[in-house]
Design a protein with these regions (language model features):
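Short glycine-/aliphatic-rich beta-strand segments at the starts of folded cytosolic domains
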Residues: 1-12, 46-48
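Short amphipathic alpha-helices in soluble, non-transmembrane regions
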Residues: 20-26, 59-69
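Short, flexible N-terminal segments of the mature chain
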Residues: 17-39
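Short, surface-exposed ligand-recognition loops at beta-strand->loop->(often short) alpha-helix junctions
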Residues: 8-17, 53-55
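Short, intrinsically disordered low-complexity segments
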Residues: 33-66
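Conserved short beta-strand edge segments in small beta-sheet-based binding/regulatory domains
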Residues: 31-36, 68-78
Length: 78
């Protein structure tokens, strides 16, 4: 999507971990959209995909780097 980047968060182990990603994005104040999860929304571990604004991509990467160390995520803005 124009003006948006894709955030990929791999190795999400449970719903609490997924909520920590959403909470981090909320704290940044970015307008994000959960696009999909693989394999499915209710199965774990999973990889979650979010659209985030291009102009927030660097802040999102920094925030997710901290969470990645804590939760073992494999997160990157594509």
């Amino acid at each position: 999507m124009l003006g948006e980047a894709m955030l990929r968060v791999g190795n999400v182990r449970d719903e609490a971990a997924m909520e920590s990603v959403r909470d981090a994005l909320d704290r940044l104040g970015v307008d994000y959209e959960h696009v999909r999860s693989e394999p499915e929304d209710d199965r774990f571990p999973q990889t979650a995909y979010f659209y985030v604004p291009d102009d927030s991509a660097e802040d999102v990467e920094w925030a997710l780097a901290d969470l990645s160390r804590e939760y073992g995520f494999d997160a990157e803005v594509l």
